[in-house]
């Protein structure tokens, strides 16, 4: 991925993840990992040829445009910024019973308004780069999730855990569901085990080049 004499720097604000990364992936002298919050500028790290940001902006709905500006300040002229995020996150299921679908949409709406989560982050990536005058913008759309027929155990676990963690912040949403919170998750699990079920999540990849001249 890098040329001779090049280097890679991985950033994360989690000490635990950085520690894990250093233990497992930092054997090469050209790879380093540092704790850093991408909401803060990259001033102390020099300029990069390529910045790659995956599954981060969705957690900062309000701050995302400013975060992208911070990233751009850390790029060399002619460097590339690559943004990757999901769109319509957690919301694409067929044929989900109406009461369950209603709760999922209310849940994501609550996370968006009260917890700054952005289930529609992916569709905004192109506009971020376009508005900042980036050149040679390229996009790709892929399936991050594409589940039909028999579900893999790890996919079932991940989906149940994802909705379970989110629901802990909004337990009152389940008060009107027949049987409450526990019944919802029993029904949600039953839905995912049904081989007729179809679930997908779009992953949008957006790459652009910083202009050589301002």
Predicted ranges, named:
Residues 14-16:
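Conserved SAM/SAH-binding beta-strand->alpha-helix loop
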Residues 21-22:
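Conserved SAM-binding loop
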Residues 27-40:
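Conserved SAM-binding strand-loop segment of SAM-dependent methyltransferases
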Residues 48-65:
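A short SAM/SAH-binding and catalytic strip from SAM-dependent methyltransferases
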Residues 65-80:
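A short glycine-rich, Lys/Arg-flanked "PGG" loop and its adjoining helix->strand segment in the class I
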Residues 82-151:
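Conserved catalytic/acceptor-binding region of the Class I
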Residues 140-197:
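C-terminal helical/coil "lid" or tail adjacent to the Rossmann-like core of SAM-dependent
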